[in-house]
Protein backbone atom coordinates (compact mmCIF):
# COMPACT_ATOMS: atom_id res chain seq x y z
CA UNK A 1 0.00 0.00 0.00
CA UNK A 2 1.50 3.31 -1.02
CA UNK A 3 0.67 6.93 -0.52
CA UNK A 4 -0.12 9.08 2.47
CA UNK A 5 0.59 7.92 6.03
CA UNK A 6 -1.77 8.28 8.96
CA UNK A 7 -0.71 10.38 11.93
CA UNK A 8 0.40 8.15 14.81
CA UNK A 9 -0.40 5.00 12.81
CA UNK A 10 1.25 2.56 10.46
CA UNK A 11 0.58 3.66 6.86
CA UNK A 12 0.13 0.04 5.72
CA UNK A 13 -2.34 -1.49 8.19
CA UNK A 14 -3.75 1.85 9.39
CA UNK A 15 -3.45 0.68 13.00
CA UNK A 16 -1.42 2.11 15.92
CA UNK A 17 2.13 0.79 15.72
CA UNK A 18 2.46 -2.73 17.07
CA UNK A 19 5.06 -3.60 19.69
CA UNK A 20 8.41 -3.99 18.02
CA UNK A 21 7.78 -1.45 15.26
CA UNK A 22 10.71 -0.75 12.94
CA UNK A 23 12.18 2.51 11.67
CA UNK A 24 13.31 2.41 8.05
CA UNK A 25 16.55 4.00 6.92
CA UNK A 26 17.32 6.47 5.43
CA UNK A 27 13.76 7.91 5.28
CA UNK A 28 13.04 7.17 8.97
CA UNK A 29 9.38 6.24 8.41
CA UNK A 30 8.00 3.88 11.06
CA UNK A 31 5.89 0.77 10.37
CA UNK A 32 4.75 -2.39 12.10
CA UNK A 33 7.36 -5.13 11.67
CA UNK A 34 4.88 -7.41 9.90
CA UNK A 35 3.98 -4.69 7.39
CA UNK A 36 7.45 -4.34 5.80
CA UNK A 37 8.47 -7.99 5.47
CA UNK A 38 10.32 -8.57 2.15
CA UNK A 39 9.76 -4.98 1.06
CA UNK A 40 12.63 -3.22 -0.73
CA UNK A 41 11.04 0.22 -0.80
CA UNK A 42 9.35 2.35 1.84
CA UNK A 43 5.56 1.95 1.51
CA UNK A 44 5.10 5.70 2.11
CA UNK A 45 7.83 7.53 0.19
CA UNK A 46 8.97 4.72 -2.19
CA UNK A 47 12.64 5.36 -1.36
CA UNK A 48 14.86 2.29 -1.46
CA UNK A 49 15.36 0.80 2.01
CA UNK A 50 19.00 0.94 3.09
CA UNK A 51 18.37 -0.60 6.50
CA UNK A 52 16.04 -0.84 9.45
CA UNK A 53 16.16 -0.70 13.22
CA UNK A 54 13.79 -1.15 16.12
CA UNK A 55 11.83 2.04 16.72
CA UNK A 56 12.29 3.76 20.06
CA UNK A 57 8.97 4.15 22.00
CA UNK A 58 9.80 7.79 22.71
CA UNK A 59 10.32 8.31 18.97
CA UNK A 60 6.88 6.91 18.22
CA UNK A 61 5.27 9.23 20.74
CA UNK A 62 7.21 12.19 19.40
CA UNK A 63 6.22 11.48 15.79
CA UNK A 64 2.54 11.29 16.72
CA UNK A 65 2.63 14.52 18.75
CA UNK A 66 4.60 16.54 16.20
CA UNK A 67 2.58 15.45 13.17
CA UNK A 68 -0.74 16.16 14.87
CA UNK A 69 0.50 19.64 15.88
CA UNK A 70 1.74 20.24 12.32
CA UNK A 71 -1.65 19.16 11.01
CA UNK A 72 -3.44 21.72 13.23
CA UNK A 73 -1.02 24.47 12.18
CA UNK A 74 -1.43 23.83 8.46
CA UNK A 75 -5.22 23.54 8.48
CA UNK A 76 -6.02 26.23 11.02
CA UNK A 77 -8.79 26.11 13.62
CA UNK A 78 -11.50 24.90 11.24
CA UNK A 79 -9.31 21.93 10.29
CA UNK A 80 -10.63 21.46 6.74
CA UNK A 81 -10.92 23.78 3.74
CA UNK A 82 -14.48 23.13 2.51
CA UNK A 83 -13.89 24.45 -1.01
CA UNK A 84 -10.76 22.36 -1.49
CA UNK A 85 -12.45 19.27 -0.06
CA UNK A 86 -15.46 19.71 -2.38
CA UNK A 87 -13.22 20.01 -5.44
CA UNK A 88 -11.31 16.87 -4.50
CA UNK A 89 -14.49 14.86 -4.00
CA UNK A 90 -16.00 16.15 -7.24
CA UNK A 91 -12.92 15.69 -9.37
CA UNK A 92 -12.24 19.41 -9.69
CA UNK A 93 -15.52 20.40 -11.35
CA UNK A 94 -17.42 21.30 -8.19
CA UNK A 95 -18.51 24.90 -7.51
CA UNK A 96 -19.73 26.58 -4.34
CA UNK A 97 -23.31 26.16 -5.58
CA UNK A 98 -23.03 22.37 -5.84
CA UNK A 99 -24.81 19.96 -3.53
CA UNK A 100 -21.50 18.51 -2.30
CA UNK A 101 -20.36 21.95 -1.15
CA UNK A 102 -23.61 22.52 0.76
CA UNK A 103 -23.37 19.14 2.46
CA UNK A 104 -19.76 19.77 3.48
CA UNK A 105 -20.70 23.17 4.90
CA UNK A 106 -23.30 21.46 7.06
CA UNK A 107 -20.77 18.89 8.23
CA UNK A 108 -18.28 21.62 9.09
CA UNK A 109 -20.87 23.31 11.29
CA UNK A 110 -21.20 20.01 13.13
CA UNK A 111 -17.41 19.79 13.66
CA UNK A 112 -17.07 17.10 10.97
CA UNK A 113 -18.82 14.47 13.08
CA UNK A 114 -21.62 13.81 10.57
CA UNK A 115 -21.47 13.88 6.75
CA UNK A 116 -24.45 13.15 4.51
CA UNK A 117 -23.55 12.68 0.82
CA UNK A 118 -26.57 10.53 -0.06
CA UNK A 119 -27.81 11.09 -3.60
CA UNK A 120 -24.68 13.00 -4.64
CA UNK A 121 -23.46 10.17 -6.86
CA UNK A 122 -23.64 12.27 -10.03
CA UNK A 123 -21.09 14.72 -8.56
CA UNK A 124 -18.87 12.43 -6.48
CA UNK A 125 -15.81 11.06 -8.28
CA UNK A 126 -12.97 10.64 -5.79
CA UNK A 127 -13.46 9.75 -2.12
CA UNK A 128 -9.77 9.85 -1.25
CA UNK A 129 -10.19 13.25 0.40
CA UNK A 130 -12.44 11.68 3.05
CA UNK A 131 -9.31 10.33 4.72
CA UNK A 132 -8.72 13.81 6.11
CA UNK A 133 -11.94 13.56 8.14
CA UNK A 134 -10.46 11.57 10.99
CA UNK A 135 -13.16 12.72 13.43
CA UNK A 136 -16.02 11.50 11.20
CA UNK A 137 -18.48 9.32 13.12
CA UNK A 138 -21.53 9.23 10.83
CA UNK A 139 -21.30 8.86 7.01
CA UNK A 140 -24.12 8.44 4.49
CA UNK A 141 -23.27 7.49 0.87
CA UNK A 142 -26.66 5.99 0.01
CA UNK A 143 -27.85 6.16 -3.61
CA UNK A 144 -24.31 6.82 -4.90
CA UNK A 145 -24.58 3.92 -7.31
CA UNK A 146 -21.92 5.18 -9.73
CA UNK A 147 -19.04 5.02 -7.23
CA UNK A 148 -16.70 2.16 -8.04
CA UNK A 149 -15.42 -0.34 -5.50
CA UNK A 150 -11.99 1.25 -5.21
CA UNK A 151 -13.65 4.48 -4.07
CA UNK A 152 -15.88 2.70 -1.59
CA UNK A 153 -12.85 0.97 -0.07
CA UNK A 154 -11.67 4.41 1.10
CA UNK A 155 -14.55 4.39 3.58
CA UNK A 156 -12.88 1.53 5.43
CA UNK A 157 -9.96 3.79 6.37
CA UNK A 158 -12.26 5.99 8.50
CA UNK A 159 -11.56 4.10 11.70
CA UNK A 160 -13.62 6.39 13.93
CA UNK A 161 -16.92 5.66 12.15
CA UNK A 162 -19.88 4.73 14.35
CA UNK A 163 -22.66 4.89 11.75
CA UNK A 164 -22.39 4.02 8.05
CA UNK A 165 -25.14 4.04 5.41
CA UNK A 166 -24.34 2.53 2.00
CA UNK A 167 -27.80 1.85 0.55
CA UNK A 168 -27.92 0.95 -3.14
CA UNK A 169 -24.20 1.25 -3.78
CA UNK A 170 -21.69 -1.07 -5.49
CA UNK A 171 -20.40 -2.70 -2.31
CA UNK A 172 -19.63 -6.40 -2.76
CA UNK A 173 -18.27 -9.41 -0.89
CA UNK A 174 -14.71 -8.04 -0.86
CA UNK A 175 -15.92 -4.83 0.78
CA UNK A 176 -17.94 -6.78 3.35
CA UNK A 177 -14.99 -9.03 4.17
CA UNK A 178 -12.84 -5.97 4.96
CA UNK A 179 -15.36 -4.04 7.03
CA UNK A 180 -13.99 -5.57 10.22
CA UNK A 181 -11.44 -2.73 10.15
CA UNK A 182 -14.20 -0.41 11.46
CA UNK A 183 -13.91 -1.64 15.02
CA UNK A 184 -16.21 1.00 16.54
CA UNK A 185 -19.10 0.62 14.08
CA UNK A 186 -22.51 0.34 15.76
CA UNK A 187 -24.88 1.08 12.84
CA UNK A 188 -24.65 -0.26 9.26
CA UNK A 189 -27.08 -0.05 6.32
CA UNK A 190 -26.32 -1.65 2.94
CA UNK A 191 -29.91 -2.05 1.67
CA UNK A 192 -30.42 -2.88 -1.99
CA UNK A 193 -26.76 -3.69 -2.69
CA UNK A 194 -27.12 -6.43 -5.32
CA UNK A 195 -23.38 -7.18 -5.47
CA UNK A 196 -23.33 -8.71 -1.99
CA UNK A 197 -23.65 -12.50 -1.81
CA UNK A 198 -21.61 -13.38 1.29
CA UNK A 199 -21.90 -11.39 4.54
CA UNK A 200 -19.81 -13.67 6.71
CA UNK A 201 -17.26 -10.87 7.15
CA UNK A 202 -19.80 -8.76 9.07
CA UNK A 203 -19.39 -11.16 11.98
CA UNK A 204 -16.18 -9.32 12.84
CA UNK A 205 -18.20 -6.24 13.83
CA UNK A 206 -18.54 -7.21 17.49
CA UNK A 207 -19.80 -3.74 18.47
CA UNK A 208 -22.58 -3.65 15.85
CA UNK A 209 -25.99 -2.77 17.30
CA UNK A 210 -28.11 -2.03 14.21
CA UNK A 211 -27.86 -3.78 10.82
CA UNK A 212 -30.07 -3.34 7.76
CA UNK A 213 -29.76 -5.57 4.68
CA UNK A 214 -33.19 -4.93 3.15
CA UNK A 215 -33.61 -6.03 -0.48
CA UNK A 216 -30.14 -7.60 -0.70
CA UNK A 217 -31.69 -10.39 -2.72
CA UNK A 218 -28.44 -12.09 -3.77
CA UNK A 219 -27.12 -12.91 -0.30
CA UNK A 220 -26.80 -16.67 0.09
CA UNK A 221 -24.20 -17.03 2.82
CA UNK A 222 -23.57 -15.58 6.25
CA UNK A 223 -27.05 -14.96 7.68
CA UNK A 224 -26.34 -17.41 10.50
CA UNK A 225 -23.23 -15.44 11.44
CA UNK A 226 -24.84 -12.01 11.64
CA UNK A 227 -27.84 -13.38 13.55
CA UNK A 228 -25.37 -14.39 16.27
CA UNK A 229 -23.81 -10.93 16.72
CA UNK A 230 -23.80 -10.37 20.50
CA UNK A 231 -24.61 -6.63 20.69
CA UNK A 232 -27.27 -6.53 17.97
CA UNK A 233 -30.47 -4.70 18.99
CA UNK A 234 -31.96 -4.02 15.53
CA UNK A 235 -31.87 -6.39 12.54
CA UNK A 236 -33.68 -5.70 9.26
CA UNK A 237 -33.65 -8.45 6.63
CA UNK A 238 -36.68 -7.47 4.54
CA UNK A 239 -36.85 -9.23 1.13
CA UNK A 240 -33.82 -11.46 1.65
CA UNK A 241 -33.21 -15.21 1.52
CA UNK A 242 -32.89 -15.70 5.28
CA UNK A 243 -34.20 -19.10 6.43
CA UNK A 244 -35.64 -20.66 9.58
CA UNK A 245 -32.27 -22.25 10.27
CA UNK A 246 -30.51 -18.88 10.16
CA UNK A 247 -32.97 -17.29 12.60
CA UNK A 248 -32.36 -20.05 15.13
CA UNK A 249 -28.85 -18.60 15.57
CA UNK A 250 -30.31 -15.54 17.32
CA UNK A 251 -29.26 -15.87 20.94
CA UNK A 252 -32.37 -16.19 23.16
CA UNK A 253 -30.67 -14.16 25.89
CA UNK A 254 -29.39 -11.52 23.48
CA UNK A 255 -30.29 -7.85 23.18
CA UNK A 256 -32.34 -7.96 19.95
CA UNK A 257 -35.33 -5.60 20.18
CA UNK A 258 -36.29 -5.04 16.53
CA UNK A 259 -36.53 -7.74 13.86
CA UNK A 260 -37.87 -7.13 10.35
CA UNK A 261 -38.17 -10.21 8.12
CA UNK A 262 -40.94 -8.84 5.88
CA UNK A 263 -41.40 -10.60 2.52
CA UNK A 264 -38.86 -13.30 3.41
CA UNK A 265 -40.52 -16.19 1.61
CA UNK A 266 -38.07 -18.79 2.94
CA UNK A 267 -39.53 -18.36 6.43
CA UNK A 268 -42.04 -21.10 7.21
CA UNK A 269 -41.84 -21.72 10.97
CA UNK A 270 -41.96 -19.01 13.66
CA UNK A 271 -40.64 -21.35 16.34
CA UNK A 272 -37.23 -20.28 15.04
CA UNK A 273 -37.64 -16.94 16.85
CA UNK A 274 -39.88 -18.10 19.68
CA UNK A 275 -37.10 -17.90 22.23
CA UNK A 276 -36.16 -14.27 21.57
CA UNK A 277 -38.16 -12.77 24.43
CA UNK A 278 -36.40 -9.39 24.24
CA UNK A 279 -38.21 -8.40 21.01
CA UNK A 280 -40.18 -5.15 21.12
CA UNK A 281 -40.85 -4.71 17.39
CA UNK A 282 -41.48 -7.56 14.94
CA UNK A 283 -42.45 -7.37 11.27
CA UNK A 284 -43.61 -10.49 9.43
CA UNK A 285 -45.49 -8.68 6.67
CA UNK A 286 -45.66 -10.64 3.43
CA UNK A 287 -44.28 -13.89 4.89
CA UNK A 288 -46.86 -15.87 2.94
CA UNK A 289 -45.25 -19.25 3.48
CA UNK A 290 -45.46 -19.23 7.28
CA UNK A 291 -47.51 -22.30 8.19
CA UNK A 292 -46.28 -23.18 11.68
CA UNK A 293 -45.42 -21.54 14.95
CA UNK A 294 -48.03 -18.76 15.16
CA UNK A 295 -48.66 -19.77 18.76
CA UNK A 296 -45.13 -18.56 19.54
CA UNK A 297 -46.35 -14.96 19.15
CA UNK A 298 -48.07 -15.03 22.53
CA UNK A 299 -44.65 -15.45 24.22
CA UNK A 300 -43.39 -12.01 23.19
CA UNK A 301 -44.64 -10.22 26.29
CA UNK A 302 -42.42 -7.17 25.63
CA UNK A 303 -43.69 -6.63 22.09
CA UNK A 304 -44.77 -3.04 21.31
CA UNK A 305 -45.23 -3.28 17.52
CA UNK A 306 -46.33 -6.27 15.44
CA UNK A 307 -46.93 -6.40 11.69
CA UNK A 308 -48.22 -9.74 10.46
CA UNK A 309 -49.92 -8.44 7.30
CA UNK A 310 -50.63 -10.97 4.57
CA UNK A 311 -50.40 -14.03 6.83
CA UNK A 312 -52.74 -16.52 5.18
CA UNK A 313 -52.94 -18.94 8.13
CA UNK A 314 -53.90 -16.36 10.76
CA UNK A 315 -57.55 -17.03 11.49
CA UNK A 316 -57.96 -16.08 15.12
CA UNK A 317 -56.77 -13.36 17.49
CA UNK A 318 -56.28 -15.91 20.27
CA UNK A 319 -52.54 -16.07 19.52
CA UNK A 320 -52.34 -12.32 20.15
CA UNK A 321 -54.37 -11.99 23.34
CA UNK A 322 -51.36 -12.04 25.70
CA UNK A 323 -49.57 -9.15 23.96
CA UNK A 324 -50.96 -6.64 26.45
CA UNK A 325 -48.11 -4.16 25.90
CA UNK A 326 -48.79 -3.94 22.17
CA UNK A 327 -49.23 -0.39 20.85
CA UNK A 328 -49.17 -0.98 17.09
CA UNK A 329 -50.80 -3.96 15.37
CA UNK A 330 -51.22 -4.61 11.65
CA UNK A 331 -53.04 -7.69 10.37
CA UNK A 332 -53.99 -6.18 7.00
CA UNK A 333 -54.82 -8.52 4.12
CA UNK A 334 -55.07 -11.56 6.40
CA UNK A 335 -57.89 -12.98 4.28
CA UNK A 336 -58.83 -15.73 6.76
CA UNK A 337 -58.78 -13.55 9.88
CA UNK A 338 -62.32 -13.79 11.26
CA UNK A 339 -62.24 -14.51 14.99
CA UNK A 340 -61.41 -11.26 16.80
CA UNK A 341 -61.91 -12.62 20.32
CA UNK A 342 -58.89 -11.55 22.31
CA UNK A 343 -58.24 -8.20 20.66
CA UNK A 344 -60.35 -6.48 23.32
CA UNK A 345 -57.58 -7.33 25.82
CA UNK A 346 -55.02 -5.21 23.98
CA UNK A 347 -56.03 -2.09 25.91
CA UNK A 348 -52.75 -0.27 25.19
CA UNK A 349 -53.24 -0.33 21.41
CA UNK A 350 -52.80 3.06 19.75
CA UNK A 351 -52.75 1.99 16.10
CA UNK A 352 -54.72 -0.88 14.54
CA UNK A 353 -54.76 -1.88 10.86
CA UNK A 354 -57.45 -4.36 9.77
CA UNK A 355 -57.58 -3.27 6.12
CA UNK A 356 -58.36 -6.01 3.63
CA UNK A 357 -59.55 -8.48 6.30
CA UNK A 358 -62.59 -9.70 4.41
CA UNK A 359 -63.76 -11.92 7.27
CA UNK A 360 -64.23 -9.10 9.79
CA UNK A 361 -67.95 -8.38 10.27
CA UNK A 362 -68.17 -6.43 13.53
CA UNK A 363 -66.22 -3.74 15.39
CA UNK A 364 -67.80 -4.29 18.79
CA UNK A 365 -64.45 -5.23 20.32
CA UNK A 366 -62.93 -1.76 19.76
CA UNK A 367 -65.10 -0.26 22.50
CA UNK A 368 -62.47 -1.45 25.02
CA UNK A 369 -59.56 0.11 23.12
CA UNK A 370 -59.84 3.53 24.72
CA UNK A 371 -56.25 4.49 23.80
CA UNK A 372 -56.72 3.86 20.08
CA UNK A 373 -55.59 6.84 17.97
CA UNK A 374 -55.53 5.35 14.46
CA UNK A 375 -57.85 2.75 12.93
CA UNK A 376 -57.77 1.42 9.37
CA UNK A 377 -60.68 -0.79 8.31
CA UNK A 378 -60.44 -0.08 4.58
CA UNK A 379 -61.68 -2.84 2.30
CA UNK A 380 -63.39 -4.89 5.04
CA UNK A 381 -66.09 -6.14 2.68
CA UNK A 382 -68.07 -8.12 5.27
CA UNK A 383 -68.20 -5.34 7.85
CA UNK A 384 -71.82 -4.57 8.76
CA UNK A 385 -71.71 -3.62 12.45
CA UNK A 386 -69.97 -0.39 13.42
CA UNK A 387 -70.93 -0.43 17.10
CA UNK A 388 -67.93 0.61 19.15
CA UNK A 389 -66.68 3.35 16.84
CA UNK A 390 -68.56 6.01 18.78
CA UNK A 391 -66.68 5.05 21.97
CA UNK A 392 -63.19 5.76 20.57
CA UNK A 393 -62.88 9.20 22.12
CA UNK A 394 -59.12 9.45 21.46
CA UNK A 395 -59.32 8.45 17.78
CA UNK A 396 -57.43 10.87 15.53
CA UNK A 397 -57.17 8.98 12.21
CA UNK A 398 -59.87 6.80 10.62
CA UNK A 399 -59.68 5.07 7.23
CA UNK A 400 -62.97 3.69 5.87
CA UNK A 401 -61.92 3.43 2.23
CA UNK A 402 -64.13 1.09 0.16
CA UNK A 403 -66.32 0.07 3.12
CA UNK A 404 -69.46 0.10 1.02
CA UNK A 405 -71.76 -0.80 3.92
CA UNK A 406 -70.91 2.42 5.79
CA UNK A 407 -73.79 4.84 5.23
CA UNK A 408 -74.26 6.87 8.40
CA UNK A 409 -71.65 9.58 8.94
CA UNK A 410 -73.44 10.47 12.16
CA UNK A 411 -71.94 7.34 13.75
CA UNK A 412 -68.60 9.15 14.10
CA UNK A 413 -69.86 12.63 14.98
CA UNK A 414 -68.70 12.34 18.61
CA UNK A 415 -65.05 11.68 17.73
CA UNK A 416 -63.98 15.22 18.56
CA UNK A 417 -60.22 14.53 18.31
CA UNK A 418 -60.41 13.36 14.70
CA UNK A 419 -57.70 14.91 12.49
CA UNK A 420 -57.82 12.74 9.35
CA UNK A 421 -60.81 10.95 7.81
CA UNK A 422 -60.93 8.89 4.62
CA UNK A 423 -64.41 8.03 3.32
CA UNK A 424 -63.29 7.26 -0.23
CA UNK A 425 -65.31 4.54 -1.92
CA UNK A 426 -68.16 4.73 0.61
CA UNK A 427 -70.55 5.03 -2.28
CA UNK A 428 -73.76 4.82 -0.23
CA UNK A 429 -73.10 7.98 1.76
CA UNK A 430 -75.67 10.57 0.68
CA UNK A 431 -74.94 13.40 3.10
CA UNK A 432 -72.01 14.76 5.11
CA UNK A 433 -74.26 15.78 8.02
CA UNK A 434 -72.49 14.99 11.27
CA UNK A 435 -69.01 15.94 10.12
CA UNK A 436 -69.61 19.54 11.22
CA UNK A 437 -68.94 18.45 14.82
CA UNK A 438 -65.39 17.31 13.99
CA UNK A 439 -63.93 20.76 14.60
CA UNK A 440 -60.32 19.54 14.65
CA UNK A 441 -60.49 17.76 11.27
CA UNK A 442 -57.47 18.64 9.09
CA UNK A 443 -57.69 16.18 6.17
CA UNK A 444 -60.78 14.75 4.46
CA UNK A 445 -60.96 12.34 1.49
CA UNK A 446 -64.21 11.89 -0.45
CA UNK A 447 -63.18 9.98 -3.56
CA UNK A 448 -65.93 8.01 -5.26
CA UNK A 449 -68.74 9.17 -2.97
CA UNK A 450 -71.13 9.44 -5.90
CA UNK A 451 -74.29 10.29 -3.95
CA UNK A 452 -72.99 13.44 -2.24
CA UNK A 453 -74.58 16.58 -3.68
CA UNK A 454 -73.38 19.41 -1.42
CA UNK A 455 -70.59 20.54 0.91
CA UNK A 456 -72.88 22.63 3.10
CA UNK A 457 -72.51 20.45 6.25
CA UNK A 458 -68.74 20.97 6.45
CA UNK A 459 -68.63 24.77 6.11
CA UNK A 460 -67.63 25.12 9.79
CA UNK A 461 -64.47 22.96 9.57
CA UNK A 462 -62.14 25.94 9.84
CA UNK A 463 -59.07 23.79 10.58
CA UNK A 464 -59.42 21.69 7.42
CA UNK A 465 -56.14 21.90 5.47
CA UNK A 466 -56.46 19.15 2.82
CA UNK A 467 -59.57 18.13 0.87
CA UNK A 468 -59.71 15.35 -1.74
CA UNK A 469 -62.89 15.14 -3.85
CA UNK A 470 -62.91 12.75 -6.80
CA UNK A 471 -65.57 11.17 -9.01
CA UNK A 472 -68.45 12.59 -7.00
CA UNK A 473 -70.73 12.51 -10.01
CA UNK A 474 -73.77 14.12 -8.36
CA UNK A 475 -71.90 16.96 -6.66
CA UNK A 476 -73.32 20.27 -7.88
CA UNK A 477 -73.03 22.80 -5.06
CA UNK A 478 -69.59 23.99 -3.92
CA UNK A 479 -70.89 26.88 -1.83
CA UNK A 480 -69.83 25.26 1.45
CA UNK A 481 -66.18 25.56 0.44
CA UNK A 482 -65.94 29.34 0.68
CA UNK A 483 -65.89 29.22 4.49
CA UNK A 484 -62.95 26.78 4.66
CA UNK A 485 -60.46 29.60 4.99
CA UNK A 486 -57.72 27.36 6.39
CA UNK A 487 -57.64 25.09 3.32
CA UNK A 488 -54.12 24.70 1.90
CA UNK A 489 -54.60 21.83 -0.59
CA UNK A 490 -57.71 21.27 -2.71
CA UNK A 491 -58.12 18.38 -5.18
CA UNK A 492 -61.30 18.29 -7.28
CA UNK A 493 -61.43 15.56 -9.94
CA UNK A 494 -64.17 14.34 -12.24
CA UNK A 495 -67.03 16.36 -10.70
CA UNK A 496 -68.85 16.77 -13.98
CA UNK A 497 -72.04 18.42 -12.68
CA UNK A 498 -70.25 21.33 -11.01
CA UNK A 499 -70.88 24.57 -12.86
CA UNK A 500 -70.11 27.31 -10.32
CA UNK A 501 -66.49 27.27 -9.19
CA UNK A 502 -66.66 30.73 -7.59
CA UNK A 503 -66.37 29.47 -3.97
CA UNK A 504 -62.91 28.09 -4.75
CA UNK A 505 -61.57 31.56 -5.57
CA UNK A 506 -62.21 32.58 -1.93
CA UNK A 507 -59.67 30.05 -0.60
CA UNK A 508 -56.93 32.65 -0.18
CA UNK A 509 -54.56 30.33 1.75
CA UNK A 510 -54.59 27.48 -0.75
CA UNK A 511 -51.11 26.47 -1.99
CA UNK A 512 -52.01 23.43 -4.10
CA UNK A 513 -55.06 23.36 -6.37
CA UNK A 514 -56.12 20.60 -8.75
CA UNK A 515 -59.18 20.94 -10.98
CA UNK A 516 -59.09 17.98 -13.34
CA UNK A 517 -61.71 16.57 -15.71
CA UNK A 518 -64.20 19.26 -14.69
CA UNK A 519 -66.16 19.46 -17.92
CA UNK A 520 -67.96 22.73 -17.13
CA UNK A 521 -64.92 24.69 -16.01
CA UNK A 522 -64.35 27.52 -18.48
CA UNK A 523 -63.85 30.74 -16.49
CA UNK A 524 -60.61 31.04 -14.51
CA UNK A 525 -60.66 34.79 -13.91
CA UNK A 526 -60.91 34.20 -10.16
CA UNK A 527 -57.49 32.55 -10.09
CA UNK A 528 -55.85 35.94 -9.64
CA UNK A 529 -57.15 36.00 -6.05
CA UNK A 530 -55.07 32.95 -5.11
CA UNK A 531 -51.79 34.83 -4.86
CA UNK A 532 -50.18 32.24 -2.58
CA UNK A 533 -50.68 29.39 -5.05
CA UNK A 534 -47.55 27.26 -5.58
CA UNK A 535 -48.96 24.31 -7.56
CA UNK A 536 -51.79 24.44 -10.10
CA UNK A 537 -53.12 21.41 -11.99
CA UNK A 538 -55.76 21.91 -14.70
CA UNK A 539 -55.88 18.49 -16.34
CA UNK A 540 -58.29 17.47 -19.08
CA UNK A 541 -60.49 20.57 -18.75
CA UNK A 542 -61.43 20.85 -22.41
CA UNK A 543 -63.68 23.92 -22.04
CA UNK A 544 -60.76 26.13 -21.00
CA UNK A 545 -59.57 28.34 -23.86
CA UNK A 546 -57.57 31.00 -22.04
CA UNK A 547 -55.84 31.50 -18.71
CA UNK A 548 -55.17 35.21 -18.88
CA UNK A 549 -54.31 35.71 -15.21
CA UNK A 550 -51.64 33.08 -14.75
CA UNK A 551 -48.95 35.77 -14.77
CA UNK A 552 -50.29 37.13 -11.46
CA UNK A 553 -49.41 33.89 -9.64
CA UNK A 554 -45.85 34.96 -8.86
CA UNK A 555 -45.26 32.17 -6.29
CA UNK A 556 -46.19 29.39 -8.72
CA UNK A 557 -43.61 26.59 -8.84
CA UNK A 558 -45.57 23.94 -10.73
CA UNK A 559 -48.13 24.45 -13.52
CA UNK A 560 -49.91 21.70 -15.44
CA UNK A 561 -52.52 22.25 -18.14
CA UNK A 562 -52.02 18.90 -19.85
CA UNK A 563 -54.70 17.69 -22.27
CA UNK A 564 -56.54 21.00 -22.25
CA UNK A 565 -56.88 20.61 -26.01
CA UNK A 566 -58.67 23.92 -26.61
CA UNK A 567 -56.31 26.08 -24.58
CA UNK A 568 -54.95 28.88 -26.75
CA UNK A 569 -53.53 31.48 -24.37
CA UNK A 570 -51.42 31.58 -21.19
CA UNK A 571 -51.26 35.27 -20.40
CA UNK A 572 -48.18 36.45 -18.53
CA UNK A 573 -46.35 33.12 -18.53
CA UNK A 574 -43.00 34.90 -18.74
CA UNK A 575 -43.67 36.55 -15.35
CA UNK A 576 -43.60 33.23 -13.47
CA UNK A 577 -40.02 33.69 -12.31
CA UNK A 578 -40.30 30.93 -9.66
CA UNK A 579 -41.72 28.27 -11.99
CA UNK A 580 -39.74 25.01 -11.80
CA UNK A 581 -42.06 22.49 -13.46
CA UNK A 582 -44.34 23.03 -16.48
CA UNK A 583 -46.58 20.46 -18.15
CA UNK A 584 -48.17 21.49 -21.46
CA UNK A 585 -48.65 17.96 -22.82
CA UNK A 586 -51.51 17.66 -25.28
CA UNK A 587 -52.09 21.42 -25.48
CA UNK A 588 -52.11 21.37 -29.26
CA UNK A 589 -53.93 24.71 -29.52
CA UNK A 590 -51.10 26.80 -28.06
CA UNK A 591 -49.27 29.03 -30.52
CA UNK A 592 -45.49 29.10 -30.91
CA UNK A 593 -45.35 32.54 -29.23
CA UNK A 594 -46.47 30.96 -25.94
CA UNK A 595 -43.66 28.41 -26.09
CA UNK A 596 -41.13 31.13 -26.86
CA UNK A 597 -41.85 32.60 -23.42
CA UNK A 598 -40.43 29.44 -21.82
CA UNK A 599 -36.93 30.69 -22.56
CA UNK A 600 -37.45 33.56 -20.11
CA UNK A 601 -38.26 31.31 -17.12
CA UNK A 602 -35.03 31.36 -15.05
CA UNK A 603 -35.82 28.49 -12.65
CA UNK A 604 -37.45 26.02 -15.04
CA UNK A 605 -36.10 22.49 -14.45
CA UNK A 606 -38.73 20.13 -15.91
CA UNK A 607 -40.81 20.58 -19.06
CA UNK A 608 -43.42 18.19 -20.45
CA UNK A 609 -44.48 18.95 -24.01
CA UNK A 610 -45.61 15.63 -25.46
CA UNK A 611 -48.37 16.15 -28.04
CA UNK A 612 -47.80 19.90 -28.26
CA UNK A 613 -46.28 21.93 -31.10
CA UNK A 614 -43.10 23.07 -29.38
CA UNK A 615 -40.68 24.90 -31.74
CA UNK A 616 -37.29 23.22 -32.16
CA UNK A 617 -35.48 26.41 -31.21
CA UNK A 618 -37.19 26.35 -27.79
CA UNK A 619 -36.31 22.70 -27.18
CA UNK A 620 -32.67 23.32 -28.09
CA UNK A 621 -32.41 26.30 -25.74
CA UNK A 622 -34.02 24.41 -22.86
CA UNK A 623 -31.65 21.47 -23.38
CA UNK A 624 -28.70 23.83 -23.41
CA UNK A 625 -29.80 25.18 -20.04
CA UNK A 626 -30.06 21.67 -18.59
CA UNK A 627 -33.85 21.52 -18.39
CA UNK A 628 -35.25 17.96 -18.21
CA UNK A 629 -37.54 17.53 -21.22
CA UNK A 630 -40.18 14.83 -21.52
Curated annotation (Swiss-Prot):
Keyword Zinc found: yes
Zn-finger (RING-type) residues: 10-46
GO biological process, one term: cAMP biosynthetic process
Protein name as it appears in the record: Putative adenylate cyclase regulatory protein
SMART domains in UniProt: LRR_CC (SM00367), RING (SM00184)
SUPFAM superfamilies, per database record: L domain-like, RING/U-box
Organism for this UniProt entry: Trypanosoma brucei brucei
Primary role: May interact with adenylate cyclase to regulate its activity.
Amino acid sequence: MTGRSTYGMCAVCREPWAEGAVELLPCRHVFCTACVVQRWRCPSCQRRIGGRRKANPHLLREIADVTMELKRYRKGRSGIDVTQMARKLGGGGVTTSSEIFRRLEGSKNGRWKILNLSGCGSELQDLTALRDLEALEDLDLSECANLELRELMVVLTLRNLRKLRMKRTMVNDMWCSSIGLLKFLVHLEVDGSRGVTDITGLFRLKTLEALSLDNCINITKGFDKICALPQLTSLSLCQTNVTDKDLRCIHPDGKLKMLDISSCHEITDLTAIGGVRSLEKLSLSGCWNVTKGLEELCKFSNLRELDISGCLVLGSAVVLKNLINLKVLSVSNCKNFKDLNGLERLVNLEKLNLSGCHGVSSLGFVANLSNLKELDISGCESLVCFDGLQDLNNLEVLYLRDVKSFTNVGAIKNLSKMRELDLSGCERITSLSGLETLKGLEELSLEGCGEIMSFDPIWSLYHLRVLYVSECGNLEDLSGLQCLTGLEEMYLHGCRKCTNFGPIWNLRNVCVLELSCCENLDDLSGLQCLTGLEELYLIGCEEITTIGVVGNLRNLKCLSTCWCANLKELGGLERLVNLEKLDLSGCCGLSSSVFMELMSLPKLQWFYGFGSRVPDIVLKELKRRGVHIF
